[in-house]
Amino acid sequence: FQYSNSGKAFLVGAELEVRKNFGFISKQMEDLVFVANMSYIYSRVNLTSVKNNSSDELIRPMQGQSPYIINLGLNYVHPKWGTGASILYNQTGHRLYATGEVGNPAWYEHWRPLLDFQISQKFWKNRGLIRFTISDLIAQKTIFYQNADLGKERQYQKAKDKVVLSQSNFRNYTLQLSFTF
């Protein structure tokens, strides 16, 4: 892979964030909170003016930039007991992993869902905390592919695109114990 800096690039985006507790349903549910954060990002790099450019795409997205990001979550904290729990979902859109050149097209990373769960309990007059986390519950493979349409449709198309790397992902279990003195 070769990297060349471009003199022309453009990026613009919008973000929406929502946070709402469920107290409107009943008083007992006011400690349950829904959170959402969504972003749309449009990025373009123009390589037409780069000398000795061998890229297969002259106008492409910025390397590593997803066109969207979605974060969703449900959080619960019991104020008297010090018990907390959360489930979080994250997804980023497909993104350019490595730029290509003529004869060796760019690699894109296909989006994959991430789902995390966490439960915690305070103790010892709220000075201690034990937390158990399971990260990447879905553990879907990460797929890197070369786009068959060369710049037209960058979304992964299983029937057309060439998978160059399929990487397994695993659940991660964490138990944390902390104290504040």
Where are these regions (language model features)?
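Extracellular/periplasm-exposed beta-strand and loop segments of Gram-negative cell-envelope proteins
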Residues: 1-9, 43-52, 57-64, 98-100, ...
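C-terminal beta-signal and adjacent terminal beta-strands/loops
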Residues: 90-99, 121-181
